[in-house]
Amino acid sequence: MLVLRGAPALSEFRTKKLMQSIEALNLPVHALFAEFVHFAQVSAQLEANDQQVLDKLLTYGPKIQEKQHKGLLLLVIPRAGTISPWSSKATDIAHNCGLNNVERLERGCAFYIDADPLNDTQLIQLKNVLHDRMTQSVVSDLQDASILFKHEAPKPLTSIDVLGGGREELVSANVRLGLALAEDEVDYLVSSFEKLGRNPNDIELYMFAQANSEHCRHKIFNADWTIDGQTQPKSLFKMIKNTYEKCPDYVHSAYADNAAVMEGSFAGRFFPQADNNQYRYHHEDIDILMKVETHNHPTAIAPFSGAATGSGGEIRDEGATGRGSKPKAGLVGFSVSNLRIPGFEQPWENDYGKPERIVTAFDIMLNGPLGGAAFNNEFGRPNILGYFRTYEQKVTSFNGEEVRGYHKPIMLAGGLGNIRKQHTQKGEITVGAKLIALGGPAMNIGLGGGAASSMASGESNEDLDFASVQRDNPEMERRCQEVIDKCWQLGENNPIQFIHDVGAGGLSNAFPELVNDGGRGAVFSLRNVPNDEPGMTPLEVWCNESQERYVMSVAPENLATFTDICARERAPFAVVGEATQARHLTLDDSHFNNKPIDMPLDVLLGKAPKMHRDVQSKALTGNAFDVSNIDLDEAALRLLHLPAVAEKTFLITIGDRSVTGLVNRDQMVGPWQIPVADVAVTAAAFDTYQGEAMSLGERTPAALLNYGASARLAVGEALTNIAAADIGDLKRIKLSANWMAAAGHPGEDAGLYEAVKAVGEELCPALGLTIPVGKDSMSMKTQWQDAQGDKAVTSPMSLVITAFGAVKDVRKTLTPELTTKGDTCLMLIDLGAGQNRMGASCLAQVYQQLGDKTPDVDSPELLKGFFLAIQQLVNEKALHAYHDRSDGGLFTTLVEMAFAGNTGLDIKLDALTGDNASALFNEELGAVIQFDADKLNQVDAILAANGLSGVSHVIGTLSDDDQIRFSREGEPVLQNSRGVYRNAWAQTTHHMQRLRDNPECAEQELASKNDLNNPGLHAALSFDVTEDVAAPYIAKGIAPKMAILREQGVNSHVEMAAAFDRAGFASVDVHMSDILAGRVSLSEFQGLVACGGFSYGDVLGAGEGWAKSILFNAMARDEFSAFFERNETFSLGVCNGCQMLSNLKSLIPGAEHWPHFVTNQSERFEARVAMLEVKDSPSIFFKGMQGSKMPIAVSHGEGRAEFAQTTGLEAALDSNTIALQYVDNYGKVTEQYPANPNGSPAGISGLTSKDGRATIMMPHPERVFRTVANSWHPDDWQEDSPWMRMFRNARVYLG
């Protein structure tokens, strides 16, 4: 084993934050220093040249001053017996660089601790701060890392002596293994194995427990019900299915697959042809798939990993729909208990304590969103929708006084995708079909996730809780998705017959489900399962929940095609079994020469006992909420600090929202990028204005007073949100319903039944809405003991609705951005019809009240009329702005619109009934619309035709100053400056950013928000955006070949290909594996573009691993060097491609002054809209664009330009090779955050070679080449945005 020192692992402010965590434990630690250490397992001593390559390979990242090692060494390494995702990717790079004697690379982090002597307890506490016990170990000597390369012998299975010891043996195993089997399931298993005449193996019991857990089987939703002695006619699931029976319109797949499918658009899907890899449009039906999952239990234990794998699992559900499909855009949501942000605690936030095994709500929101965002970012899916609610309060509800809240959080992960009509249904699994596991290896993690998720928090052993959390590797999932994409792109020749994702229960659930759903049995070989921990037992190999895996069946005659696709994408797979005619499951173990599983599928899946719920309903005992003594000024500021109302930028800018180039509406609105959008919208393709929309609705605290109302409000809010998009027919909208409840808690079961009936039997059929997909989580309760005795925090019954719909014209989507042009009116449409019910409102929450009566959907017809009226107004382009009324009421709706429009307001409450507090802060459904004053009659007529005249009120207009005024009958009711409200609204985000990211950047961003003169994003162009300079060359009919270059983990190649295709190029998909295998030569191409993403997951530095696999591979180096030397060629590197090409500068003529790119100053992934200025440089891409200033999408974690020498910046400026610079909204070159999102010196965002043929840039022009793909744009831009000019300039350059 070789030991190689690396760079310092922590920046100054990260070290400071770690020290603060250690000081909070009162440990006598004075200082620490952290450094990466690399370990190489080699098969033979490396020659000098190889050693030099290895040294260079492991030198990466930013320059940080090295320090002397002193103090106690604590070396954090991956858990012994595992192979980390870092290791597998770094080893791949080493092999691609020709280091064949390097068998494996691994990385640790050496902490040198300056401390007084530590006792054993203190040492354990310190180690717990420094490492993640799920995936890491701590040793005290560098040579101890050699355990990383030792392999244990496989461990045998164990059997449970049911035949000899009877039922008690199984009861004991149930507790020991954390199986969560019900009493009747224990009886069923005892009976089944007595009939088989043998004892069950542990693996068989575990497999049964996972497959039949509440998490997987949804036993409560399929149960028979008796409520208050009355037998109920339907199960919960049947009431949900009732919506489909009443309205099956536009639904192509429901309840039968990993996701539901609905009718979408007809447009041109853009992907490469199989025969020559050239991209082209394929005009066909582009149907919409939809799925929303929850990952609550793991997120309470390990927030980053729980949320990351929650998103990853949901993405796999989408990709595994039908015979393979394409995830497109994501959403995420969180409900947690009170944040109690250190230094920003709020008056309503009492601390009721928590058990040790779960983390705090603050920790969940500090790390969980990062996990969800990181997975989506690296996979390459834009995350463009979300919600965030906190609730934790002692209330008097149905069960008397108790604490209700989200100690067990809701972590929502969902999204939409697209699927070919021909692949919507699963195919036939033929007898003899190869049963394949695609994706990463088995590791001993995530055991028992399904069963653990099915228990109330506190019922299981703490070690089992930790064992049930999975770990993520999104770059692997991206490779798998590329394989699935290549399969469905073959159309009728798609080799995938049947596909499922691997989730809860691992292969033990996925493979039996696959063959059972396909009507087959199977014979499997345990030792064919790819395995990174050979020492695992058969149970651990078969049942672990290692992520990024799919199972599928492929006919033997198509296996060669599938194998070739996987090889090109470097996606590992294995044939694990074969499908059989007999519905029997056999698992052979060649190592121990036995059969760990040998049972009929019917025993596993067919006849488990059906649940019966016999429950009682509870009467309400709430008290009215008295608002008469509330100070309105204080109430307004409290509400603006409540997370459900407050600004959520800290949850949004961490997530890529522009990847794919198909995002039309993300959360950020207008020139000031205010996060207030009601709906997320994507375009169906690059050649259409049709698209897809999704929105969220949830009013969970209302369930503490009225279960049915809470459910109806969730549906209503999803509709008032999606109404901002151009949908048309209400039947075009389909819903996902995610149900969370504390089953067994007094009154909650009957309440759940009431809520499901309210939407499934009543509201949705009345509206013509269908719920074709959903999920339930029935153990939303946390129990523990402390010095004060038994404690519990029980979640409200929680329904989260996601609405999905096909969009007719994405350009018509409305936002809350008020226009300040002309004479306009603001109108409130009040679907509560003046009732102003205040129960369970945000105002009640911030005063620690609950109230008695909640808002409700009293008239489905009124809600339907509202939706149709707004749709007509959208279609006729009669409105300037739209914002629904929700958390915080009318006050919040209006101030958010004022923030988006950067304007003051004059609001008159005269037309609104009731007291001022209720008028301002009630959360009845409704919306505020803005329109030209001279269109009042047109608007009135449309509202009247839909039955809304009596609930629609003109309430005011914009003010000429910065004040937001509310008055009644000429008397002031509430008034403050927009600046005061804007600052208050920003505080939650600001404090979370300060504690999570670089505090200096957080301070700079707050200062930017408080700059009331900030002119916002704008465009000042030096050229005519409507001119197509490439048209004369395209007319010649010659399309120069353009290499759209990608490496494993790259995710922005399709939109790049589309941009060059539009400019007249023949865009060709080129994988690095094509070049390394000699299948493709760069001599065929006149242009090359290295695309954005996360090559090799950014191990060994962003883009550096990719570059070094070229520099240190003789064949690849020669290919690229020859290409760059040819005078008639050009090259472009964007984002990850920019990072990569900057590390190839030794091969690129005239690029010697280029920097490389390192971690952003914020030390956070930054997804922003930034202003760029095009400089006067030789770049062929920016000819005629010099002096232009315009917005562009930015999405990267390592974009800060760093020069090797201190004189590097000056040399770059002197050589005129800086092509692009970040400017602020005043148009000045800036290093200030967030206008400069990464802290690059002199605002550097792009550079060129001295002859202009090679250009690199961190921002993403390919994602915004269409005007509709820009988060904000001037009204006069047409189809093409100004960034399209640079691609056309490249075509002009070739002549």
UniProtKB/Swiss-Prot annotation:
The active site is at residues 1135, 1260, 1262. Its main location: cytoplasm. Residues 302-327 are annotated as: Disordered. Phosphoribosylformylglycinamidine synthase involved in the purines biosynthetic pathway. Catalyzes the ATP-dependent conversion of formylglycinamide ribonucleotide (FGAR) and glutamine to yield formylglycinamidine ribonucleotide (FGAM) and glutamate. ATP binds at residues 306-317, 677, 886. It is an enzyme of class 6 (ligase). Its EC number is 6.3.5.3. SUPFAM superfamilies: Class I glutamine amidotransferase-like, FGAM synthase PurL, linker domain, PurM C-terminal domain-like, PurM N-terminal domain-like, PurS-like. In the N-terminal section; belongs to the FGAMS family. Keywords: ATP-binding, Cytoplasm, Glutamine amidotransferase, Ligase, Magnesium, Metal-binding, Nucleotide-binding, Purine biosynthesis. GO terms for molecular function: ATP binding; metal ion binding; phosphoribosylformylglycinamidine synthase activity. The keyword Metal-binding applies. PANTHER family: PHOSPHORIBOSYLFORMYLGLYCINAMIDINE SYNTHASE (PTHR10099:SF1). One of its GO terms (cellular component) is cytoplasm. The gene is purL. PROSITE patterns: GATASE_TYPE_1. It comes from the Bacteria. It catalyses: N(2)-formyl-N(1)-(5-phospho-beta-D-ribosyl)glycinamide + L-glutamine + ATP + H2O = 2-formamido-N(1)-(5-O-phospho-beta-D-ribosyl)acetamidine + L-glutamate + ADP + phosphate + H(+). Residues 1042-1295 form the Glutamine amidotransferase type-1 domain. InterPro entries: Class_I_gatase-like, FGAR-AT_N, FGAR-AT_PurM_N-like, PurL_large, PurL_linker, PurM-like_C_dom, PurM-like_C_sf, PurM-like_N_sf. Mg(2+) binds at residues 678, 717, 721, 884. Monomer. GO terms for biological process: 'de novo' IMP biosynthetic process. It is found in: Cytoplasm. Pathway: Purine metabolism; IMP biosynthesis via de novo pathway; 5-amino-1-(5-phospho-D-ribosyl)imidazole from N(2)-formyl-N(1)-(5-phospho-D-ribosyl)glycinamide: step 1/2. It holds the Pfam family FGAR-AT_PurM_N-like. This is Phosphoribosylformylglycinamidine synthase.
